[in-house]
C-alpha cells in the first residue's frame, strides 16, 4: 500500500479489522520473563506513560506545519492552539511547477497512536479538485517532538491552474480520533 492514496473511491474488497488497542502498561507487562524482549520494549515504548501537556487530553498534539519548497522551508505555521485556527487566514503561495511537501511537528502522549493520517480536500471555486490521504504512521509517546514529512508533490502549472485554492486539512488516526482540523488557502502563482 502506498503512503498516500486518493480517497475518491474505496476499491478494497477486504475489510481490515484492527486489533484491539492495548495500553503501554499492558504491552510492557506482557512477556515479563523474556529479558531481551523486556529491554527491546522499554527502548521502543519507554518506561511508561508520557504526558507532555496535562491539560490536553489528546494523544497527538500537533505543534506546527512547514511548507518545504524545493527542500527549503518557505513558510511555517503554529498549529498548537486549535482555537486560534478557527478564524485565522493561513495563506501560502507556491510558484507553479515547484516541488513541495509538508512537514508536521507533533507530540504523542499518554498512549500509542496507531495509523495517524493527514487528509486534505482541495477546492477551487467550490469544486473539489483533489482529495488525498497520507499515512503518517504509528507512534509511541515521547517527550521529544516527532516529525512527519509528506511525499514530494509538484504544484500544477499553466494558466488554467494558477489561482486560489481552499484546502481543508485534518489529522486523524485509525480510531477516527480527530487531532486537528483546519483550513488554509493555497495560491499557485506564475512567479
From Swiss-Prot:
Keyword Cytoplasm: yes
Superkingdom as given in the UniProt entry: Eukaryota
Cellular component terms (Gene Ontology): cytosol; membrane
Intracellular or extracellular location(s): Cytoplasm
Role, per record: Regulates the GDP/GTP exchange reaction of the Rho proteins by inhibiting the dissociation of GDP from them, and the subsequent binding of GTP to them.
Region named Disordered: 1-22
Biased composition (Polar residues): 8-21
Keywords (A to Z) from UniProt: Cytoplasm, GTPase activation
InterPro entries: Ig_E-set, Rho_GDI, RhoGDI_dom_sf
GO biological process, one term: Rho protein signal transduction
Predominant location category: cytoplasm
Family: Belongs to the Rho GDI family.
Organism, scientific name: Caenorhabditis elegans
Any one GO MF annotation of this record: GTPase activator activity
Stated name of the protein: Probable rho GDP-dissociation inhibitor
